[in-house]
Amino acid sequence: MTSFVNFQSRCDRLQHYEVRYPSHAIIKAVFVPSGSAETVGASHPKAMIMDSYNFMTPINENQTLYFWFQLRNFSPGDAALSKVMDDGVRAAFAEDRRVLAAVHEGFKNQATQSLDLATDRAPLTFRKQLARMIAAENSGP
């Protein structure tokens, strides 16, 4: 596939992850000409931005609806690019669903204590905060 960036140099990629409790994730990917990420970032006139939004809505203890969409600020009328990106995003989110389902099964049938790795700090922090929120909700007013 041809590169979709609108500049000739290598690029810097900025990634922003945000979680909104209990179940929203927002990911912003910014591509700018190499060397400009620290000075102008997303405000660069040639910045190419892709935003992804994930929404998980529990139905019950074992079922969750998973919605997502992605936006971009470049080539809005390019149907071929839209298809390539849509296919890629669908494949990525389908993979996420399989992983999330496997993680859920693992937690449901957990026989040993979790191994907390430093690289897992963000999801561990998320789970701990969510557990505190659930406990507070279940404890009543």
Question: Where are the regions a protein language model picked out?
Answer:
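C-terminal catalytic domain of Rieske-type non-heme iron oxygenases
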Residues: 1-141
